Design a protein with these regions (language model features):
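A conserved acidic beta->alpha catalytic loop
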Residues: 39-47, 88
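Donor nucleotide-sugar binding loop of glycosyltransferases
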Residues: 15-18, 42, 65, 91
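Conserved donor nucleotide-binding strand/loop of the catalytic core
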Residues: 34-36, 47-75
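Short aromatic/hydrophobic "clamp" motif used to bind/position activated sugar donors
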Residues: 81
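Acceptor/aglycone-binding surface of glycosyltransferases and processive sugar-polymer synthases
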Residues: 61-75, 92-170, 174, 195-212, ...
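Cell-envelope/extracellular polymer assembly enzymes that use nucleotide-activated donors
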Residues: 5-7, 34, 175
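Hydrophobic helical membrane-anchoring modules
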Residues: 1-2, 167, 172-307
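Short, well-formed alpha-helical segments that are part of the catalytic scaffolds
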Residues: 14-28
Length: 307
């Protein structure tokens, strides 16, 4: 087995209190890795602390974790990528095990499933939201991950270089998960410790705002990845409403030969037309998506797997 080049990517914004310890922990766990801190418009001393700890600091001016991930995946070239947050909550000591799993099993992604060592590490709202989103992904895509929103992941080069990274914020973890599910990539999960933030470090994740954005991302990707099912559901609902409205009119017409409520009849007809249009739209878009998925699969296969 040849020596693999490893890049550790740590997105950061105002993590002066934690980034130094994070870099030091990953340096101890992966002494041969190159550690990058991608600063996202920090207003504190994050950059200087990261440099002092031995990290290479890059800057992404556009706010949002998704923008940082997009930039880092485009700029960094390595055989194996380790991504974690710079807030010292993830267990750096688990990284060698995750990398070994990726290489030996020839996987494209290993997810660090968070197991909190203290109740304060996982806020109740985040835990509930994670469970709901994980359940939605499982129902929509047929399979899912135990921790969809985990920010601790190890990737192969072909995953990183085939990932479009369209998200801008914290919904990027959801996009990463759906990318793996959509292309049926070989993946695995490893339970890792999840720690409380150091004093002075505060979470940038809003339970409701970012949860809503993640939910919209799932629905958008559902529409894009499964258009036949998405528009089929809409068409079915419209068709059922149309039939419910039309049945009393049909009964009255059969008895009297008259249509007593013309606007209602027009509404029923319009809804049925929309139902058919929705079905046909789903069929057309499904053909387009199959073509796009084939191109993405070919782009993925053009890159060498972990060795």
């Amino acid at each position: 087995m040849k020596q693999q080049s490893v890049a550790v990517i740590l997105p950061c914004r105002n993590e002066e209190a934690a980034v130094g310890a994070t870099v030091t922990a990953f340096r101890a766990a992966l002494p041969d890795a190159v550690i990058y801190v991608f600063d996202n418009n920090s207003t504190d001393n994050t950059v200087n602390v990261a440099r002092a700890a031995g990290a290479i600091v890059r800057t992404e001016l556009t706010p949002g974790k998704g923008n940082v991930v997009r930039r880092s995946f485009a700029d960094i070239d390595a055989d194996v990528y380790v991504m974690a947050d710079g807030d010292a909550t993830y267990d750096a000591a688990a990284a060698p095990t995750m990398i070994r799993e990726l290489i030996e099993c020839r996987l494209d992604m290993v997810v660090g499933v968070r197991s909190s060592v203290a109740d304060a590490a996982f806020r109740p709202g985040h835990r509930l939201g994670n469970a709901i989103l994980t359940g939605m992904l499982s129902r929509i895509f047929g399979r899912s991950f135990s921790d969809v929103l985990s920010g601790y992941r190890v990737f192969s080069r072909r995953f990183v270089k085939s990932f479009p990274a369209l998200s801008e914020g914290f919904e990027v973890e959801t996009e990463i998960s759906i990318h793996a599910l959509g292309l049926h990539m070989p993946v695995a999960e490893i339970v890792t410790a999840y720690k409380v933030r150091p004093e002075g470090s505060t979470s940038k994740l809003s339970t409701f705002r970012d949860g809503w954005r993640i939910l919209l991302t799932i629905l958008t990707l559902f529409r894009i990845e499964k258009p036949m099912l998405f528009f089929g559901i809409i068409g079915t609902l419209l068709g059922l409403v149309s039939i419910v409205i039309a049945v009393p009119l049909a009964v009255t017409y059969a008895k009297t030969g008259l249509v007593p409520r013309l606007p209602t009849a027009l509404l029923s007809t319009g809804l049925m037309i929309l139902a058919f249009l929705s079905f046909f739209s789903g069929m057309i878009l499904d053909t387009v998506v199959r073509g796009r998925r084939e191109l993405r699969r070919l782009a993925y296969l053009a890159l060498r797997p972990p060795e």
